[in-house]
Each structure stands twice: as structure tokens, then as C-alpha cells.
Amino acid sequence: MRTHIQEIIVVEGKNDTNTLQRYFDCDTIETGGDQVNQKTIDRIAKAQKTRGVIIFTDPDTPGEHIRRIINQNVPDCKNAFIPKDKAKTPKKVGVEHARKEDLWHALEHCVTFSNYQQSLSWEEFIDLGLVGDARYRYTICEKLFIGPCNGKTCFKRLNQMNVHKEDILKLLKEESYE
């Protein structure tokens, strides 16, 4: 029996839909590429109001672009992230290439980004070494299930999740990076 997913999952294309529906009882909205049009945004907004939405785009630049557009236009969507190494073939990257276990892990650890009051200052972010050291940043992103990202995006996502300096220090200590 396939696991039922209440929310509607936003994906990039038909192959993503086919893969998810092979493993899960779920409905999807396909964006059809990285130029998300207003009609698609309106469908996603309606779905968010009625059933909730999980944005599950590919772990690449176009996927991040789509995710950013949707999050800016439709508040309080859940976001599922899958690591690039769990969603690729030798030539391609995408949700459709992931194993069932990895897809489920990503869906279980969705995060919601909200309009935020700053919980972490830029100075604290720099002091933590998250601007210059991709390794630290990757560790934090992985632990919080927010997908790998550059410094600016990481700073924004941490604040949107109301993460404080103490929370990051605790995560780094668990990984013995201090």
C-alpha cells in the first residue's frame, strides 16, 4: 500500500510526477519549466488554501529558481529538499532519479519558510564562519533540511526558520566542528 500525502506536491515535470505517484498516493502540480507563469502560481495558491502545498523541485539552479518564485508568491508552503547526490544519474539531476527512501526522507523533513523577524544577525552569521566556509554551511543546511545553498540564501532561510546563533552552535558542536 502506498503512503498517502495530503498536500499537493509541486514538481517541475511529468517525470517527477510519475516517479512520486509510483511510490506514493499523491497529487501534483507541474510547473513545466523554470518560467513559472501566473496561471500556475494561481493554481498553487488555491491548492495551498485547500490542501496545503509541498514544493519539491530538482536540486539544481532552475529548481531553486522555481522554488524562490513560488515561495515569494504563495506564503507558508512546505519545502522538501533532496541532496543532489541522491537525485542524479551520471548525466542528469532531478527528483525523478531518486530512490523511494530518499524521496520519503525529504518529504518527512519538509520545512516552511515564513516572513521573518531577524533571529540571526549578519555579524553572527559571519562570526559562525558560514560565509566563507561551504563545509560548515553545508553541515547546517543538511541538519536543518534546507538544501545546500550559498551564504546569502542560507542566511535568509535560517532567519525564515527563526534559527538563532545558539541553535547553530549546538548543531556544529554535535558535528564536532568547533
Segments the model singles out, each with a brief description of its role:
Residues M1-E12, T17-D25:
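Glycine-rich, flexible N-terminal cofactor/catalytic loop recognition
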Residues R2, R22-D27, D34, Q38-E178:
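TOPRIM fold recognition
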